[in-house]
Amino acid sequence: MKLLILSILLSLTACNKKEIEMEKPYIKPIEPQTTSNYLALGDSYTIGEGVLVTERWPVQLAAALTQEGIPVETPQIIARTGWTTDELLIAIEAAQIKDTFELVSLLIGVNNQYRGRSVEQFRADLILLINKALEFSGNDPNKVFMLSIPDWGATPFAEGRDRDKIAREIDAYNSVIWQETNSRNILFVDITRISREALTDQSLLAADRLHPSGSMYSQWVQELLPKLKLRLQKP
């Protein structure tokens, strides 16, 4: 009888051991985080005229997003000082871009205003540029964003000119940008207010006293970051 009880106990112990082994929790392996590619389209503000490469706002933005847990590659930049909307369109065609990007930015228009181009022509070109940006993003508006045009009238370069007129024209262009981005559910970020602070704080300007300094670009990035994170983290 004792042998029978001992045999049963040993059998139960063996079964319990097997159950314990089978019930080990599943630990999901950590998937490596992918790094997003980024295309920045624009003019002197995007190429960072007068500042170091590391101070360009697209480069600062990529670094800030990476620090926030959204890894972004060093941006591919198609931009040049002095470009208008039509010149940027020509450059984009010449670049023959084949890739799809996780992030596409657009900042353009100041040279249209400076050269006295019409708002209507700006709108026509802007629509083409926005369509290109959407195409590069795989037609995902959450991956595209546009900045407002800075007000160069707040810089010493505008001394002796009608600053109020420049501001009104910049505002008119920015109104068009807001309309065209808003209708497509594209993020629009107003940095014009920050650019106007240069009127009383010239540390926000590069040595040429026309273009933003790395410090101003940092402020742009801080304005962009929370809004862009919300877009990029959408399921």
Which residues does each predicted region cover?
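Sec-dependent signal peptide recognition
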Residues: 1-7
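Generic short amphipathic/hydrophobic targeting helices enriched at N-termini
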Residues: 4, 16-18
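Residues that line or immediately flank small-molecule/substrate-binding pockets and catalytic motifs
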Residues: 8, 42-43, 108
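C-terminal motif of bacterial Sec signal peptides marking the signal peptidase cleavage site
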Residues: 11-14
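Serine-esterase "nucleophile elbow" of acetyl-processing enzymes
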Residues: 19-81, 91-99
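Alpha-helical cap/lid subdomain in secreted, periplasmic
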Residues: 71, 90-235
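Active-site-proximal substrate-binding core of FAD-dependent oxidoreductases
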Residues: 87
